[in-house]
């Protein structure tokens, strides 16, 4: 797949692997929609049946208004569109953007709102509303959950999440994303303090236990 990383994010996740994309006025270069379309079309022969273009970031919906025309052009070109989003931004542009997408990767950082705020500095209320909109509008999506010890690895929260989403028909799969520190060098380069330096990586036992928890509520669960 062709992956486009976009500048700007509304969340402040403590484990963010791309801190350089948070600031809307970051150092990324401005790219014309036509240029991205050209790249996608040129790579289309290599996409096969499962390929396409994925928009990540940062937070893609942060630039929803500018992306809508590009999404329309990509649809006309027959290119599969995937959006990786935290679901925390909502307006008419975001609504149209997600309507045009073929698949949404919805990152639910934590189900407990207070713990979500501790992890991201934002509420998860809109994320849950976005999930409900995807379900109501029959938009396929993957639910993704980063497993962070002391922050998002609580049995009661995962069970509450499962109870909330267990009857959603549009969730094609659940992905458990192990916590990693691959972006720490970026914090060092940007002279920023990485606040989770004392948090340990997940053990295989923890990942297996989390997978079993999610499988109580969802048919298809992967650890990625």
Per-segment meaning from a language model:
Residues 41-45, 49-52, 57, 61-182, ...:
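Conserved AdoMet/S-adenosylmethionine-binding subsite of the radical SAM
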Residues 20-26, 117-123, 191-199:
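Short glycine-enriched, charge-decorated loop/helix-capping segments at active-site entrances
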Residues 19-53:
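Conserved alpha-helical substructure of the radical SAM core
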Residues 140, 205-224:
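C-terminal accessory region of radical SAM enzymes
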Residues 1-31:
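Canonical Radical SAM [4Fe-4S] cluster-binding loop centered on the CxxxCxxC motif
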Residues 163-166, 172, 188-213:
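A structural motif corresponding to the C-terminal lobe/cap of the Radical SAM core domain
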């Amino acid at each position: 797949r062709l992956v486009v990383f976009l500048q700007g994010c509304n969340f402040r996740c403590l484990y963010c692997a791309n801190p350089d994309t948070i600031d809307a006025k970051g150092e990324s270069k401005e790219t014309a929609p036509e240029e991205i379309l050209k790249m996608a079309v040129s790579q289309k022969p290599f996409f096969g049946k499962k390929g396409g273009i994925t928009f990540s970031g940062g937070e893609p919906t942060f630039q929803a208004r500018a992306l809508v025309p590009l999404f329309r052009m990509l649809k006309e070109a027959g290119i599969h569109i995937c959006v990786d989003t935290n679901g925390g931004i909502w307006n008419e542009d975001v609504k149209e953007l997600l309507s045009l997408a073929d698949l949404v990767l919805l990152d639910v950082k934590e189900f407990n709102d207070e713990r979500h705020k501790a992890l991201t500095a934002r509420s998860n209320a809109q994320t849950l509303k976005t999930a409900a909109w995807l379900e109501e509008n029959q938009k396929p999506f993957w639910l993704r959950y980063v497993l962070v010890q002391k922050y998002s690895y609580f049995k009661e929260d995962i069970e509450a999440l499962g109870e909330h989403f267990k009857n959603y028909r549009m969730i094609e799969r659940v992905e458990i994303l192990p916590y990693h520190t691959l972006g720490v060098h970026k914090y060092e380069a940007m002279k920023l303090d990485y606040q989770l330096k004392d948090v340990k990586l997940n053990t295989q036992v923890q990942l297996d236990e989390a997978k079993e928890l999610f499988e109580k509520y969802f048919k298809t669960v992967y650890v990625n």
